[in-house]
Amino acid sequence: RDAQESRGLGDVYKRQMCMARQSDGVFYLRLEDTDKKREIEHGADEIITSLAQYGVCFDEGAAADGEAEKGSYGPYRQSMRKEIYQTFAKDLVKRGLAYPCFCSAEELDEIRKAQEAEKADMGYYGSYAKCRNLSIEEIEANIKAGKEYVLRLRSDGNAENKITCRDLIRGNIEMPENIMDVVLLKSDGIPTYHFAHVVDDFLMGTTHVIRGDEWISSYPLHEQLFRASDLKMPKYAHIAPIMKLDGGENKKRKLSKRKDPEASVSFYSKAGFPVQSVLEYLMTIANSNYEEWRMKNPDADMSQFKFKLEKMPVSGALFDMDKLASVSRDVISKMSEETLFDEISVWAKDNDEKLNAYITASPDKFRESIKLWKYNGKKVRKDIAKWSDLSEMFPYLYGDGVDGYEFDEKLTADERKAFLTAYISAYDHKVDSSAWFDGVKAV
């Protein structure tokens, strides 16, 4: 399953790893929109459209605004599943595994200050959980008095005990049990992410959850919630983030949507990297054996590669723009002239006004011009890594022309004209560079 997140390169990277289609399963989108402060307007539209261009399509789940959801396990927006979560929460209360907490913000702040003074772990747990052992009479009195409350898990964890997360990428990870009496339902009856995640993954039949490694620390809580609710837990794979080198000391850091323009998928669209190039590159950093497979299967569709989670990097793949460009040159070199025409035409409409005008006015000339940079004689060239390279590398074809060239002062205007006329007459774009140079010398 896939939860609502941002539309960055890392998300395309993560969703490329989805094993649903290789296992005849279902890949679905669930919008986790219970936190209205963080909700993104038209979030479903952005997720679906931005990822669709990279071939990431959902089999079922939440749909774009105004469209009907697909699938039998909806609604797929958590804000529409409030009563479902409350039913599961009620069962936990009946079994003594959850309780109402009436602590005010001021009381919670006092607990925090006491923990700071005592240098204790922060949180609502153990002796610091003031409402944990309230009697039924006290609870009823508080509710009748109109006191607001949240519903908390009654944790049975012990910090001295260890649990094992059997991660599909990292292997077994030992961690202390959860001891926190976390909030399950907020005062408005809306669930927290952690509780909704457990209920929905069970009801929607989730078998595998693939998520970022920042969620590893939440595993003990999720394990406890699944166990308390007597629900089968899915398998987890925690993916390390894409990294980049930062500064002169070559320090690695996480690729950031705030700092790095290349972290956004729109960066690649605007630059003109073909979708297939980006996906091909991401696979080279996602699975250590992909490049070897590609060498043996140069013309095979990427979907034929058997992706393995255990082959993913544990420490985080290093993003390399030069490597992306190299991969993209290979991808573009294999495109037919017709495919090149179609892809460049679509890209130019939104990203290169002059090139678009040229293609629109002279489509046949543009088709012919493709041959000039695609071939060197009979050999296929690998000069172009992205569509924006065209105007930069071939301004005499698609840009403003070549400015500022100065002939030798010894040449008269007539001699210059005679040279250009002879060169044009002798030029043959079908010959290779060696034959071309011999022709220039002859002129």
Which stretches of residues belong to each language-model region?
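Single conserved hydrophobic/aromatic residue that forms the stacking wall/gate
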Residues: 2-10
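Catalytic adenosine-cofactor/nucleotide-binding cores of aminoacyl-tRNA synthetases and other
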Residues: 229-413, 417, 424
